[in-house]
């Protein structure tokens, strides 16, 4: 209980010096596993750094995000219908980002038979981590993007993030797509899942 109280105090302290304009309840990025949950996990990490592990933080984020994707296990990104529907969801997400100015997002035009591509050039969670010297734990929060896509019979191909570059890139294709052969996955020295 004392640890939880410290985490809550740290969370309130960190947020008091940061943005309060992230779109409120209507912003899907503020839902379960979203921006504020990431900041809460970072607050936990600050308080419990000596006794927690990278994997524990990664599991916390997975426990927040993955239940929603598990409910969508019928989605198969290998099928054009689902790929097109995912693309439309990303275009809709971009319109929200344009309204809230939290994540700056661009979505490439849809091409039949090709992977979906979008990117964030601004990420509040990454900005928060950079500002507070917490970039070492960001891979544990970002890697869930790979796991969530895998639950949709999709694969994420990523080469950079807003934490260590100027954008967070998302190339998404079906898990059987030949495109993947040219982009093997690996973990970099910081712990980020990436692709070549």
Residue ranges and their predicted role:
Residues 136-141, 175-178, 188-193:
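Short, low-complexity, polar/charged sequence segments that are solvent-exposed and flexible
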Residues 147, 185-196:
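Short, cationic low-complexity segments
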Residues 106-164:
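Short, hydrophobic/π-rich interface segment
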Residues 1-48:
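N-terminal, charged low-complexity regulatory/assembly segments
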Residues 159, 165-175:
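C-terminal edge-of-domain segments
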Residues 125-127, 175-182:
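Short, charged/polar, Gly/Pro-enriched secondary-structure boundary elements
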Residues 33-131:
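Amphipathic interaction/junction segments at domain boundaries or subunit interfaces
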